[in-house]
């Protein structure tokens, strides 16, 4: 597949940070055990901090996308959503549902409301926000690489945005899953940039 390197104007670029919350990222979090080994191997959190800091310095738009459990709705579903409801993961107003301190939103940054399923575009006004901001490029990082990150990236791509996943700022349940997405999914969007690659492309 042909790799396309983009030059991204910062004012036309949105960094979407998916579920950098205590339940995923911190000891004691309800899903931390699922990703602990892999995010250590991938250096996910340190890379995400560099990604956020670099994007801020260059003037890119930042959108934080926490998952906030809708217990009634999720408990009526099957599979992953039902499991989250049963485990009370990302419960509203809980420690586990809070965005981690290292990536704490600044006052002028958007914290998306209403993300209660897989893609950040479903049940939210994310698409409206992006169009109103005049965004052309969408960059996605976070959790889980093969689930919410991938689904959100597909949503952005289908809406016509130049889309990239930043794999070294993502977390999966295993190295095998992470490497599968990096190898088989990320190239579909045009390239597989590291944090450093992206920050060079952003101007």
Where does each model-flagged region fall?
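Metal-dependent active-site segment of extracytoplasmic phospho-/sulfohydrolases and closely related
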Residues: 61-63
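Short acidic/His/Gly/Ser-rich catalytic and metal-binding motifs that mark active-site loops
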Residues: 23-28, 72-74
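Active-site-adjacent betaalpha module
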Residues: 1-14, 49-58, 70-73, 81-203
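Acidic/histidine-rich helix-loop elements
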Residues: 25-41
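N-terminal nucleotide-binding beta1-loop-alpha1 segment
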Residues: 16-21
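Charged catalytic carboxylate motif
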Residues: 43, 47
């Amino acid at each position: 597949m042909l790799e396309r390197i983009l030059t991204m104007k910062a004012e036309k670029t949105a960094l979407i940070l998916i579920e950098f919350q205590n339940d995923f990222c911190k000891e004691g979090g309800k899903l931390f055990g699922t990703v602990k080994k892999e995010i250590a191997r991938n250096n996910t959190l340190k890379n995400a901090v560099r990604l956020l800091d670099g994007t801020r310095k260059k003037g890119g738009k930042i959108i934080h996308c926490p998952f906030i459990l809708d217990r009634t709705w999720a408990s009526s579903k099957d599979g992953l959503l039902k499991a989250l409801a049963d485990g009370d993961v990302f419960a509203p107003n809980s420690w586990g549902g809070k965005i981690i301190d290292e990536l704490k939103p600044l006052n002028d940054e958007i914290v998306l409301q209403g993300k209660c399923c897989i893609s950040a575009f479903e049940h939210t006004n994310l698409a409206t926000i992006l169009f109103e901001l005049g965004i052309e490029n969408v960059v996605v990082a976070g959790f889980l690489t093969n689930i919410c990150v991938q689904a959100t990236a597909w949503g952005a791509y289908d809406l016509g945005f130049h889309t990239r996943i930043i794999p070294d700022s993502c977390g999966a349940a295993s190295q095998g899953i992470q490497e599968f997405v990096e190898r088989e999914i990320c190239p579909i969007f045009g390239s597989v940039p590291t944090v450093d690659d992206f920050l060079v492309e952003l101007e």
